[in-house]
Amino acid sequence: MRVLVVDDSALVRMAVTDILTKAGIEVVDTAKNGREAVEKALKLKPDVITLDINMPEMDGLTALKLIMEKQPTPVVMLSSLTKEGARETLEALKIGAVDFVTKPDGALVDLSSVAQELVRKVQMAASTSLNVLRLQNLKKIKGEVVRGNWKGKTKDVCVLIGSSTGGPSALEMIIPRLPADIPAPVFVVQHMPPGFTKQLAERLNSISEVEVKEAENNERVKDGVVYVAPGGYHMKVRRAANVVRIKVVDGEPVNAVKPSVDVTADSVVQAYGGNVVGAILTGMGEDGAYGMKLIKDRGGLTIASSEDTCMVFGMPKAAIELGGITSVKPVFEIAEEIVRFLEVKLNER
């Protein structure tokens, strides 16, 4: 595997090169700004690029756009943990970056705390589907809002969506197509660090008909609202006296992640029984497989994103293999399937 390392800091370039080389990954070259990055990407055709966002001459976002147009390559962004960093990182994911690693704060460049994560994400990026990068670039996806035939609402139903690597772009193909009158709350669990999920919710809210917000502890759940699990916490729901409230809880990671789709799924099934529509999108690992099976076994309906429209097919594949999936659909048809499945649930006697 051949990697191009791009950062305006010589210390960061050295640190990243050192981490990757020790893991047996070849660093073919480094670049100190976006302009160099584009030139070297075209010339060297690396398997993966690590890319800083804030650089002189040409920033990372501009470079990323050009690379995606001229030489689509899996890119892992190195970003800061600031609010601005979170916003720029989401923009990078939208443009086509595969994933990101947050650089620890501080003047000293110590990347040892993220070394394992960096290696894992670079290795995963190398195996991602470039067809999916191209699919995102085409942006053919933004269809109309899907209208449902709800008539009178007969029962409490909810929607749960789980995603990881490639998830923000996938969610942009689904959430903006859900109608404002959707007769259910939508719970979204996207694997992300603290701070990033708030930015994700704000971004989705600005392009959607439904309200999208980061979930808050103890808030009462309402239909037509999309609740995004806060990064670094698990999101549960509890029903008491026929009122459903959100519980944002700390605790150990589950499936090595926090928030975990499985944790939310478990509580959703306790609160809603089989009146759940679940969807599992692109992502690495197996989080959500158990949760989708749980929903399906209780009589809920579940959807997995098809392999050819997943950046990483890990989570949907695990859910399918476990027998937890009712229907497999391309990501740009999942909004329709969610609405159709809600109609089925509402019409069940």
From Swiss-Prot:
Residues 2-118 form the Response regulatory domain. The modification 4-aspartylphosphate is found at residue 52. Phosphorylated by CheA. Phosphorylation of the N-terminal regulatory domain activates the methylesterase activity. Pfam families: CheB_methylest (PF01339), Response_reg (PF00072). It catalyses: [protein]-L-glutamate 5-O-methyl ester + H2O = L-glutamyl-[protein] + methanol + H(+); L-glutaminyl-[protein] + H2O = L-glutamyl-[protein] + NH4(+). CDD domains: CheB_Rec, REC_CheB-like. PROSITE patterns: CHEB (PS50122), RESPONSE_REGULATORY (PS50110). It is an enzyme of class 3 (hydrolase). Gene3D superfamilies: 3.40.50.2300, Methylesterase CheB, C-terminal domain. SUPFAM superfamilies: CheY-like, Methylesterase CheB, C-terminal domain. Residues 159-345 form the CheB-type methylesterase domain. The active site is at 164, 191, 287. Its main location: cytoplasm. Disulfide bonds: none annotated. One of its GO terms (biological process) is chemotaxis. GO terms for molecular function: phosphorelay response regulator activity; protein-glutamate methylesterase activity; protein-glutamine glutaminase activity. Its EC number is 3.1.1.61, 3.5.1.44. It is found in: Cytoplasm. Contains a C-terminal catalytic domain, and an N-terminal region which modulates catalytic activity. Involved in chemotaxis. Part of a chemotaxis signal transduction system that modulates chemotaxis in response to various stimuli. Catalyzes the demethylation of specific methylglutamate residues introduced into the chemoreceptors (methyl-accepting chemotaxis proteins or MCP) by CheR. Also mediates the irreversible deamidation of specific glutamine residues to glutamic acid. Belongs to the CheB family. This is Protein-glutamate methylesterase/protein-glutamine glutaminase.
